[in-house]
Each structure stands twice: as structure tokens, then as C-alpha cells.
From Swiss-Prot:
Entry GO terms, CC: cytosol
Residues annotated as catalytic: C146
Binding site for (6R)-5,10-methylene-5,6,7,8-tetrahydrofolate: H51, D169, A263
Top-level lineage group: Bacteria
UniProt-listed InterPro entries: Thymidate_synth/dCMP_Mease, Thymidate_synth/dCMP_Mease_dom, Thymidate_synth/dCMP_Mease_sf, Thymidylate_synthase, Thymidylate_synthase_AS
Pfam families cross-referenced by the UniProt entry: Thymidylat_synt (PF00303)
The protein, known as: Thymidylate synthase
UniProt record, GO biological process: dTMP biosynthetic process; dTTP biosynthetic process; methylation
Subcellular location: Cytoplasm
Gene3D superfamilies assigned to the protein according to its UniProt record, in alphabetical order: Thymidylate synthase/dCMP hydroxymethylase domain
Species of the source: Legionella pneumophila (strain Corby)
Annotated GO MF terms: thymidylate synthase activity
Length: 264
């Protein structure tokens, strides 16, 4: 995962100081891309320990179309707690847009089901896109989508995915996002009887919060360890029938966790 460390270093060296919505302040660069060959290991950051339970359960929660944190809480995941209201609701965030995008005529579109069917029936399509950036509902969301849009691409019977992340909390959020969308790519590939190829991460405003700079510098002193591999233990009936127990990150080694405050 030297690719990720290079982004940390780039921001520390080239970033400009900017104000932000949270009032914390950031070092920021605009426009950056990282590519991960999914055939050479699963891209879990190894220079600090990641909570893989949170990564998997959050993705399963998205895939359920859920926007209430009760499922996450039941499974020991707290990463959305800061934004939920007293009832645990977040408004029409990722899961709603992925699975039930509202149309003007009162219907809804299940973007994920549609894109899986498109991959199976027309893998050369240039329209294999899922978007969470619903302009008409942004003001109802507890947090507007940071990872806003992703696109699949099939070549030589292999599936790739590219994510556009308009706002990237590089120390806390991006390692989760890389792992989450890489996992999704593996799952979609399995459902479509394809092999995996690449996950490509493209960031817009890529930033380190000013209270994360020391942690980023600590991480840069650490040597990356070999990447784990991913085992999916069964092929369920659909993309929406996976369970936490279906996934195993084999030989995940990491340096110790590095604590950092979340910017709300």
C-alpha cells in the first residue's frame, strides 16, 4: 500500500491550508488517482490496523438500502453515530440512493440491481454507473455523499471499478473507502462470473485535517507489510444476500492502530 502512503506524503508536501465545513481546517490538494491491482492482494492499509468488521458491515448496510444506524449498532459499528438523529436516522444517504433512487413519476430505481444485470447482459456498456449524488435530496441527508459515483468496466472477462470521491478524509476515511469498494468489486465480479482486475480511486478535494498531521507523519515512518488476500466462502443467490461470515481477509498483518479525532 505504498500508493496510499504516497498520497499522504503528497498532501503533507504540496497541500494548501483551507477552511472547511467542520471548522477544523485542512491541508488539501485537488485531483489525485490511485490504482490497485486486485489480483495482487486485497488493498487493506497495513501501516495502521483497520477495523475490518466496520468495513464489511457498513457495505452490507449500504447494500440493504438501509439508512438507519440500528443495524450498525447491533453489529458493533459506530462510524455513523455522529451524524444520526435521535432515532438513528440519516436521511436518504447511500443505501437509499443505491437501491431506491426516486424518480419524478413516483417510482424508484434500484441502481445496483440494474448495474449487475447490465454487466451480465451488456458488459461492454459505458453506462455501468451507480450514483449517490442525488441533487434533489442532498438537503435531506445528514451527510452529503463523499464517495459520490462509481463505474464498472469489463475487459477480458475481468471486472474493474472506478470510484469518484468528491471529498476525501485521507487519514480516516480513504483506507475504509478503498477497502469497501474493492470488496464490492469482488462481490459483483463473483455474481457476474467474472474475475477481478483493478480498483481505481479518484479523489477531488483530498485532505488531511490539521489535527491528523502528526498521525499521518507517524504512518509514513512505518514500512508497509504484505497485503492479505480475500476469501469469499460462498456465492449467495444475489448481491444482496451476503453475510458478514462470508468474508475472510487471509493473513492480514498490520502495524498498530493510530487514533485520530473525527471531524463532524
Amino acid at each position: 500500500m505504498k500508493t496510499y502512503l504516497q498520497l499522504l506524503e503528497h498532501i503533507l508536501q504540496q497541500g494548501v491550508e483551507k477552511s472547511d465545513r467542520t471548522g477544523t481546517g485542512t491541508l488539501s490538494v485537488f485531483g489525485y488517482q490511485m490504482r490497485f491491482d486486485l489480483t495482487k492482494g486485497f488493498p487493506l492499509v497495513t501501516t495502521k490496523k483497520l477495523h475490518t468488521r466496520s468495513i464489511v458491515h457498513e457495505l452490507l448496510w449500504f447494500l440493504r438500502g438501509d439508512t438507519n444506524i440500528s443495524y450498525l449498532k447491533e453489529n458493533g459499528v459506530t462510524i455513523w453515530d455522529e451524524w444520526a438523529d435521535n432515532n438513528g436516522d440519516l436521511g436518504p444517504v447511500y443505501g437509499k440512493q443505491w437501491r431506491s433512487w426516486p424518480t419524478a413519476d413516483g417510482h424508484t430505481i434500484d441502481q445496483l440491481s440494474d448495474v449487475v444485470q447490465q454487466i451480465k447482459s451488456n458488459p461492454d456498456s459505458r453506462r455501468l454507473i451507480v450514483s449517490a449524488w442525488n441533487v434533489g435530496e442532498l438537503d435531506k441527508m445528514a451527510l452529503m455523499p463523499c464517495h459520490a459515483l462509481f463505474q464498472f468496466y469489463v475487459a477480458n472477462n475481468k471486472l474493474s471499478c472506478q470510484l469518484y470521491q468528491r471529498s476525501a478524509d485521507v487519514f480516516l476515511g480513504v483506507p475504509f473507502n478503498i477497502a469497501s469498494y474493492s470488496l464490492l468489486t469482488h462481490m459483483v465480479a463473483q455474481q457476474c462470473n467474472l474475475d477481478v482486475a483493478e480498483f481505481i480511486w479518484t479523489g477531488g478535494d483530498c485532505h488531511l485535517y490539521l489535527n491528523h498531521l502528526e498521525q499521518a507523519q507517524i504512518q509514513l515512518t512505518r514500512e508497509p507489510l504484505p497485503l492479505p488476500s480475500l476469501t469469499i466462502k460462498r456465492k449467495p443467490a444475489s448481491l444482496f444476500d451476503y453475510a458478514y461470515e462470508d468474508f475472510e481477509f487471509v493473513n492480514y498483518q498490520s502495524h498498530p492502530a493510530i487514533k485520530a479525532p473525527i471531524a463532524v
